[in-house]
Structure formats: C-alpha cells, structure tokens
Amino acid sequence: MANPNNIIRPSAFSSNERPVPSERHDLPEQHRVDMSVEQLTALIGQTVAQVLPGLIKQMNNNTLDFTDVSDQVVEPEYRNNLADFDRVPDIVKSIREFSGNPAEFGSWKKSVDRIMETYTPFVGTPKYYGILHTIRNKIVGSADVALESYSIPLDWKAMSRCLTLHYADKRDITTLEYQMSTLVQGHQQSVEDFHQDVYKNLSLILNKVGCMQMSRESEHFVTKMYREKALDTFIRGLRGDLPRLLAIKEPADLPSALHYCLKLENQTFRSNHAANKGQQSSFRGNEKPIPAPRNFQPSNAFGHRQPPPVPPRHPMRRPPQYLGQPFPAPRQHVSNFGNAPFIPPRQNYQQQWQQYNAPPRPFATKPQPRPEPMDVDGSVQTRNINYMNRPHSDINKRQKNYNIQTVNMRQPSIEVTGSSSSMTGYQRSMQDYETQNNINSTLNEYCDGQIDNLDSEQRDHVLHFLE
C-alpha cells in the first residue's frame, strides 16, 4: 500500500540500513587541488584580511561620486498615463521637514527609509516620481544647500549618502561604544536619570548603525548586540543591591530593567518606613519624654546654640529702663527640676542690640551746591528807596494794615444855607454821605502823595489816625 501522505514510517528509523549517498561529481584532474583543512582555513583568513579593510574604509569614508547615478524618471510605458502623478499618499505628505539639525537626522532618515522601501515596487511609475519629488521638497535650509552644492540627482540613495556625510555623528562606533561602557550611576543621581544617560548613548550608536551601508540582517544583528551591551552597562553601573537583584530577575531589555528597579525601590521604601514607624511607637510606649529645663535654649542642626532673638526696632510696648540698670535677677531656686544650669539674666534691649548688631551708620548728607547770585540788569536799577519793601525795618513793630476801610463816622453839625426845618431826613442823610466821601477822598490823596516822604514814626501816626 502506498503512503499517500508521504509519511516516514517508524520502521525506517529502526532499520540499520543507511541512505545511499548521491553520486559524486568529481572535478577534472586539471582543476583538482589537494589541500588540507589547515591550508584551506589559512587561505580563507588571508582573503578576508585583504578584502575586509577595504570594505570598512569604503563604508566609513563615503565618497560622493555619483557619476553612475542619474535622476529618477518615469518609464516610457507610463508616460501616456500621468493620472497618478498628483496622487501622493498622505503618509508621504505627513513627513516633517529636515532643516539640518543633526539631532533629528537619525529618526528622520529612518521614517523616509520605511516609506521608500514600501513603495519600491512602484519605481519608474508617476506615483513613485511624485513621492520622491515630495521628499526632496521636505529638505530645506542648510540641508538643501548641501544637496545643491554637490549636484545630487533626484535619487533617494544619493540624497541619503550626502546627508549622512554632513549631519551624521562624526564619532566612530567604537568611540560611542566605549563611552557607553564607562557610564556609572552617580552618588546624587537617581535611577531614572542614569537610565536616561544609557539610553541616550544607545540611541547615538543605533543612529550610527542606521547610517551605515549594510544588509538588513546585519543591521538587525548589530542592533540586538548593542542593546544587550546597553542593558549590561545599566545593570553594572547601579549602586547598592540593585545589580544582584536584577541578575536574579534577568530583564530582557532596558525598559524592563528600569521597571524592576523602580519596583524594588518602592518596596524598600515601604519596608523602611514601616520599620521606622514601629520603632517610634515602641519608644513612645516604653519611655516617658524628659521635660526640658527652665533655661533651655534650642540648638540648631550643628549643635550650636542659637543666639537670643533680637527685639523689634519699634516695639509696641518697650520695657521700662531705669537709667541703664539690668532687669532684676530671677529666682535661682527651682523645685520642680534638677540642678539646672543657671544662666545670668539678660541685659536690657538696648545693650543686647548693641552686642549682637552693629550700631547703625549715620547717613551721609549730600553736599548742597552753593547758591549762585542772580544776574541783575543794571539798566533797571534805581536809587530811589522803597520803604515798603524793607522787612527788616518793621521788626518789633505793629503789623500794618494797608487795606483801609472807610467807616461812616458821625460828623459835627455843619451849617448849611436854608432852613433846616425845610430839609427832610433823607436829604440830611445824603448830605452827610457826600461830606464823608469828600473827607475820605481828600485823606486818600494826601496819603498817596505824602506817605512815602514821611519817616517811620510819622507814618505810624498817620495810619493810626486813619484807623
């Protein structure tokens, strides 16, 4: 019975028959070389030693020779149908611009590499040409100047090599690896900060690997190797018991190692907090607190006694001071406490202030400028003396009142023509008013003309008479 499923029967494993080897096709006699294993190994090693340095040098020293590279064009079979030329995918439009920042070059290049790898089957189509043209327009600033200075064609590999030469990390991968291996956690550094330092160096190494020209399998292997080295650096550089605890957990990568560290730190903190709280509660239950002495003065963290407080500059209630005498001494016998040290009484606030604080410095008065005499025009000067503007002559004298108000004084009877019996009361009052005005006007004219020519004594008599 035939075996329809082509399954190897168990009897085939138990039999002693061995499969017949296939027929060997030997080389002709003129091409056959007898060589031992040692000679073959030496030949392979010699070949690798000759070829490998050239490959490494070519990989590290990227020469911008694009003589064999031309612009990407549309294939002839698609030139009659350019409907897909403007149909650029949104994922390509969402790529951010690159202006020449070296810190952003690694991530930007990886995002473009993923897109270009996805649309590789569309090479030569109008759609691929539109995608490549959109990516070229995303390169602006100094990066655009670098591409134009080398006349880089419209090809992504050529543009990637030029940008890598200008904006990739100039340190070789060996230097970056050594710098990462020397990292340790500082005394005042937290676990999160140390993890951030290790991850930053790992990112630099991975960006350098991404800029190298290698196959995808090689890049994946190198990336995995450096991730393991970063994890080993993080575990070895931790302080305390964390390295031994992480060795038991065996984390797979850096994020899981950080998770275990934070978890162990939180557990240690809770255990220490509970232990300290239990010790404090037992101490309070067994022993009674010792009362402080009467003259106890608190001390600071360094064990030194703090100076007594300084009174305010302007207290609301100043204590009485009896001619600089100190306060009366307090009672020295204390019955409630033991042999407490006696501290002498404090002096008054004024002496204490002078002891702990320097006396205030007097304010320096700013020198005032000397007054300058006023310029007087000689043409307006006069020799006439104005006694009204001499204030020094009126010292110890009665204040003068120049605002003279006339008072209607009763005048003596004046004989008038005509019969007085025939004049009415209104006419008499009008006549008296006119007579008084004439007298006042005469006195004012006399005063205006003669008061300036009188001496001080005569002027006082006249003014007294007018009052």
Curated annotation (Swiss-Prot):
Is Hydrolase a UniProt keyword of this protein? no
Q: Which portions of the sequence form the region Disordered? A: 1-27, 272-351, 358-377
**Localization in the cell:** Virion
* Ranges of compositional bias, category Polar residues: 1-17, 272-284
Question: Which keywords are on file for this protein?
Answer: Transposable element, Virion
Write out the function statement from the record. Strongly basic protein that binds directly to retroviral RNA and may be involved in its packaging and in the reverse transcription process.
> What is this protein identified as?
Retrovirus-related Gag polyprotein from transposon HMS-Beagle
Organism in which the protein naturally occurs: Drosophila melanogaster
Q: What is the lineage of its organism?
A: Eukaryota, Metazoa, Ecdysozoa, Arthropoda, Hexapoda
This chain is encoded by the gene named: gag
